[in-house]
């Protein structure tokens, strides 16, 4: 009954130090781009900005060419917010419906071992449905002029548009319910939702070394680094997403919705996935605010925290969109993001305000770099610009920075049992970044470090391919000669780094990036081949992932 009601409600409502050949770049120029426009009657027709259109864009299916689909969506500024955001979602769903369909089967299998919505646990479906209904109730009872609630409405309109656009383009055999489409957009939140709704109780249950290692390997999401060059000539960022390899159907997106309610965050360039309105890597460039966002996830090791998660909150995805669109600095972004905290996708968000950076400056302006770490029931945030200045870099690697968050999430228990592997200061990635950050002077250096995995020879990796910047848990690692069980490695599976992205100061101004899709390839790590994991869902994906870095210019 709830799903039926839900559907009724929906109706209501570069100058750089690296080189890339022309074949390794992505641009919207050239005859290979076919634009489509959306009319005010929500009909999709060929052509760019045809008379009477309210949105236009293109999608380039280049997954097998260089690893990435590329999507560009732009709306007019003269229609209502509801129409503009619904139009952006609709055109995205329409143009990328095949990718969404292909992605969805692997996505649902990775969480539920089935792609059949009828076989997904009822408790999970109920949570998702209740959450959407809760947001609808809050929106309908809230101010129509408050900027925060305007953007909540806009995000929901965009989600509805995505659903309607998908089904308008997909054939009869490929139709999806709203709940299915919404669950895809909940990718960042879904791990915690599934744990909450499928676990009998949420009491603290100590894990042995094998159990906690597998949990960290399969939920630890990403590595990132912000680097200030030694002469302060550049401020660079690089990030690798860690995930299940079955989600490696990727889209780089540029979304521009220049309505009056988004004076600081009308346009975003970000790495993403089919059917998602957010990045969830996360790796954003936003203008005109010139904010850059990236993050890594902090795994919940204290299961009692799940008692504080419920459907009556705003999930990560919607809080992310709202903060991106309203904030003009790091403090504002953090303040907006933590409102109505769901306690799902508990990440360390890193917010870099490029407006405040001047190359070759002798000091950094305060508020240049903010971080926030949320957890179920709370958060901590701070301006860490001084730390960036003193260290020369800001690393992030699935360990809470704030001591309070570290304690609440349950890390001290495992530090006491298993040592430095679980610490913020001395885990393998922390050690590698501390040793190597001073060598990072160019964009190419950032590309190299975020791809880094020399587990056979790097002492900090201790012989395990999961202990590096760009993990490869699909490659077996061995025990140390000492046989110490604390440093023996258990987990082996299709998880790890699935990409690389990087930007520098000039790229923020040109609204470009460089990116690579797929597990890292190094002298110690051969190209990933699905032949080695044929039983894992990987429909429609390239058989071998050996893509190089490309320039993103959408």
Curated annotation (Swiss-Prot):
Keywords: Glycoprotein, Hydrolase, Lipid degradation, Lipid metabolism, Secreted, Signal
Molecular function as annotated in GO: phospholipase activity
Keyword Ribosomal protein: no
EC number(s) per entry: 3.1.1.-
Subcellular location per the Swiss-Prot or TrEMBL entry: Secreted
Main subcellular location of this protein, as a coarse class: secreted
Residues carrying covalently attached carbohydrate according to the record: 113, 140, 231, 302, 340, 546
Function: Probable phospholipase.
Family: Belongs to the phospholipase B-like family.
Protein name per its UniProtKB record: Phospholipase B-like protein E
């Amino acid at each position: 009954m709830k799903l039926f009601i839900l559907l009724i409600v929906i109706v209501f409502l570069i100058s750089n130090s690296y080189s890339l050949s022309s074949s390794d770049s992505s641009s919207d120029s050239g005859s290979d781009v076919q634009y489509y426009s959306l009319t005010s009657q929500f009909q999709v027709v060929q052509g760019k900005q045809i008379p009477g259109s309210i949105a236009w864009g293109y999608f380039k299916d280049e997954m097998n060419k260089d690893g990435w689909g590329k999507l560009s969506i732009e709306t007019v500024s003269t229609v209502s917010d509801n129409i503009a955001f619904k139009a952006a979602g609709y055109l995205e769903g329409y143009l990328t419906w095949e990718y969404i369909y292909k992605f969805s089967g692997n996505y649902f299998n990775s969480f539920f071992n089935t792609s059949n919505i009828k076989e997904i646990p009822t408790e999970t479906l109920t949570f998702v449905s209740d959450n959407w209904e809760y947001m609808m109730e809050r929106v309908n009872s809230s101010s129509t002029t408050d900027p925060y609630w305007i953007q909540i409405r806009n995000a929901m309109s965009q989600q509805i548009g995505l659903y309607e656009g998908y089904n308008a383009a997909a054939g009869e055999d490929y139709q999806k319910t709203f709940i299915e489409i919404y669950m895809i957009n909940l990718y960042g939140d879904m791990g915690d939702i599934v744990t909450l709704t499928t676990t009998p109780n949420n009491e603290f249950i100590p894990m042995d070394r094998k159990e906690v290692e597998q949990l960290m390997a399969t939920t630890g999401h990403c590595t990132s680094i912000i680097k200030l060059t030694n002469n302060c000539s550049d401020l660079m960022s690089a990030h690798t997403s860690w995930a299940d390899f079955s989600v490696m159907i990727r889209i780089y997106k540029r979304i521009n919705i220049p309505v009056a309610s988004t004076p600081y965050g009308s346009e975003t360039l970000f790495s993403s996935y089919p059917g998602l309105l957010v990045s969830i890597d996360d790796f954003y460039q936003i203008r005109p605010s010139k904010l850059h966002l990236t993050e890594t996830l902090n795994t919940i090791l204290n299961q009692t925290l799940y008692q504080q998660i419920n459907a009556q909150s705003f999930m990560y995805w919607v809080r992310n969109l709202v903060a991106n669109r309203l904030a003009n600095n790091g403090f504002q972004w953090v303040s907006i993001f933590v409102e109505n905290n769901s306690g799902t996708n508990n990440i360390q968000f890193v917010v870099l305000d490029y407006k405040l950076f001047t190359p070759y400056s002798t000091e950094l302006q305060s508020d240049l770099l903010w971080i926030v770490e949320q957890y179920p029931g709370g958060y901590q945030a701070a301006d860490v610009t001084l730390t960036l200045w003193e260290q020369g870099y800001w690393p992030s690697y699935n360990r809470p920075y704030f001591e309070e968050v570290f304690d609440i999430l349950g890390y001290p228990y495992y530090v006491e049992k298993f040592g430095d592997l679980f610490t913020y200061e001395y885990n393998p990635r922390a050690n590698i970044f501390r040793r190597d950050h001073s060598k990072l002077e160019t964009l190419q250096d950032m590309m190299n470090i975020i791809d880094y995995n020399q587990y056979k020879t790097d002492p900090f990796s201790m012989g395990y391919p999961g202990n590096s910047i760009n993990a490869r848990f699909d490659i077996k690692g061995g025990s140390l000669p000492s046989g110490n069980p604390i440093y023996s490695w258990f987990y082996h599976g299709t998880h790890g780094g699935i990409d690389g992205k990087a930007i520098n100061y000039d790229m923020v101004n040109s609204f470009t990036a460089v990116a690579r899709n797929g597990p890292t390839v190094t002298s110690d790590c051969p190209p990933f081949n699905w032949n080695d994991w044929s039983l894992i869902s990987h429909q429609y994906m390239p058989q071998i992932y050996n893509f190089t870095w490309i320039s993103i210019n959408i």
